[in-house]
């Protein structure tokens, strides 16, 4: 079912109750959460002890209204550096992990990006501020429908939402310049590799729960160059990912040990 805008030890937790686009008109300087959003960027992303330096990422995070992607009772906490529940056992990632993964992806204004794990739609909105087209997949249909409605309401016309199993990717919209995955399979899904352009980038958490690495992949000469960024813990990828034999993963070159780190989703 295709719906076009109808619709990160870093520890990740699931809490109970998760052509170039013009910026939407939702980030007016006089809207009530604008100050909180500016403080989030200055203190949580680029402040002391933080390492987000990509100006495009910081600008996008300063425009996207995170409070619009969390349940109304939690909006007062929307700009705290923490994950928040969004229903269906899922969370919206803490702002820092969104910024970190986006920076690792190196998005460009002409990119067409695939996101696996729409969740609230917040990550897709950040990517939409920086790229030409975002195709995002969510296996929980209720979340996909809600995210699509919110993204449409906020003016993100370059985001396309599909309810379905992200393990398979979005073949008819491929190839993609970049792929970002916000749930953890035990290996890199081959369909996502096949749908990645030559020279394309992928950011994905890989491994079993409590033993995962955030990995940056680049496709060169039909092969994957792999760099482990740091240990993470994300919610497992469900669907077809859970049906795959152990050890199946596309061949990758270079798998250095990651440095220790911590993060939440």
Each model region followed by its residue ranges:
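Bacterial N-terminal signal peptides
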Residues: 7-19
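Active-site capping/gating segments
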Residues: 207-252, 260-265
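Positively charged n-region of N-terminal signal peptides that target proteins for export
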Residues: 1-4
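Conserved nucleotide-cofactor-binding alpha/beta core module
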Residues: 106-224
